Amino acid sequence: MIPPLNRYVPALSKNELVKTVTNRDIQFTSFNGKDYPLCFLDEKTPLLFQWFERNPARFGKNDIPIINTEKNPYLNNIIKAATIEKERLIGIFVDGDFFPGQKDAFSKLEYDYENIKVIYRNDIDFSMYDKKLSEIYMENISKQESMPEEKRDCHLLQLLKKELSDIQEGNDSLIKSYLLDKGHGWFDFYRNMAMLKAGQLFLEADKVGCYDLSTNSGCIYLDADMIITEKLGGIYIPDGIAVHVERIDGRASMENGIIAVDRNNHPALLAGLEIMHTKFDADPYSDGVCNGIRKHFNYSLNEDYNSFCDFIEFKHDNIIMNTSQFTQSSWARHVQ
């Protein structure tokens, strides 16, 4: 018997670019005439939150360094998720120059809620996703220099050469460059890295209670302003990936506030990483996620973007989405 689709059901567009069909024991969805399997995330697929803190000193030295105010109860949202989803592992992916007492507070949080696992960025090996900055700049310089002089962007060429010469010894690394950012890029880049690891992230962190996960298990990332109201249950996602979609004035936009994958090294995120390895000015959000997904599904600008967003959207009735937009604190940016 084919299980019913969960609350995630790709919507039908007016021009029928998107449709859902079933075939024997496999369910399919399609975009623009091509079928993709609906991959199943079971009720034990781990959830992952993230908190990268620029300034741990703004918190008490013995407090959990995650914002938890009346307007922005991010820590409470995570704890609520752990309480509702007791059968799931709940990861909190963290980075920052934390005080010893703050790390102790994280450990106490893990003790109080056995399914919460605090995963420190510097405990995870992301080197397999790295590339030398010098190689990225040299490849782009060579591309410019190979063009006929009349088509060459001389200003860009000089800029690339300057950026190449400014790389400091020991910092010739794409991954390290985002450790110096401490802004959106820091958050977004390492979120992508974590979701490339997916369930393997929990195994690599060597946390008690994580050993039942397979090295290829999936993961669901949620921003800390996403509020879980009831258990999520099993979820189907197209070709093993789905993301949050914002809609403003009828215009849809893919967002990285939710990223769900059914396995590690998902091809769409690897496609985004390839762009990060190729473009000298790549953005981890618009290129690493959005353009990687577009590339994976062969989306072109000739196709209906809103329909594509319907197709790739992570939908669920038991999540109140992006609540920080109501408190002027959302990190959301809109790209098409």
Swiss-Prot record:
Q: Which catalytic residues are annotated?
A: E255
- Where in the cell? Secreted; Host cytoplasm, Host cytosol
Q: Which GO terms describe its biological process?
A: symbiont-mediated suppression of host apoptosis
Q: Which cofactor does it need?
A: Mn(2+)
Sugar attachment sites: R24, R152, R333
Main localisation: secreted
PTM comment text:
Auto-glycosylated: arginine GlcNAcylation is required for activity toward death domain-containing host target proteins.
| UniProt-recorded Gene Ontology molecular function terms | manganese ion binding; protein-arginine N-acetylglucosaminyltransferase activity; toxin activity
Catalyzed reaction equations: L-arginyl-[protein] + UDP-N-acetyl-alpha-D-glucosamine = N(omega)-(N-acetyl-beta-D-glucosaminyl)-L-arginyl-[protein] + UDP + H(+)
Name the keywords, alphabetized.
Glycoprotein, Glycosyltransferase, Host cytoplasm, Manganese, Metal-binding, Secreted, Toxin, Transferase, Virulence
Documented activity regulation: Protein-arginine N-acetylglucosaminyltransferase activity is inhibited by 100066N compound (flavone analog) and 102644N compound (a substituted isoxazole).
Residues the record lists as binding Mn(2+): D225, N322, S324
User: Impact of altering C39S?
Assistant: Mutant used for crystallization; prevents protein precipitation due to irregular intermolecular disulfide bonds
List positions binding UDP-N-acetyl-alpha-D-glucosamine. Q50, W51, F52, Y74, A224, D225, S324, S329
Q: What is known of its domains?
A: Adopts a GT-A fold and acts as an inverting enzyme that converts the alpha-configuration in the UDP-N-acetyl-alpha-D-glucosamine donor to the beta configuration in the N-linked (GlcNAc) arginine product.
Q: What does the record give as the function of this protein?
A: Protein-arginine N-acetylglucosaminyltransferase effector that disrupts TNF signaling in infected cells, including NF-kappa-B signaling, apoptosis and necroptosis. Acts by catalyzing the transfer of a single N-acetylglucosamine (GlcNAc) to a conserved arginine residue in the death domain of host proteins TRADD and, to a lower extent, FADD: arginine GlcNAcylation prevents homotypic/heterotypic death domain interactions and assembly of the oligomeric TNF-alpha receptor complex, thereby disrupting TNF signaling.
Full protein name: Protein-arginine N-acetylglucosaminyltransferase SseK1
Q: What organism does the record attribute this protein to?
A: Salmonella typhimurium (strain SL1344)
- Which gene carries the instructions for this protein? sseK1
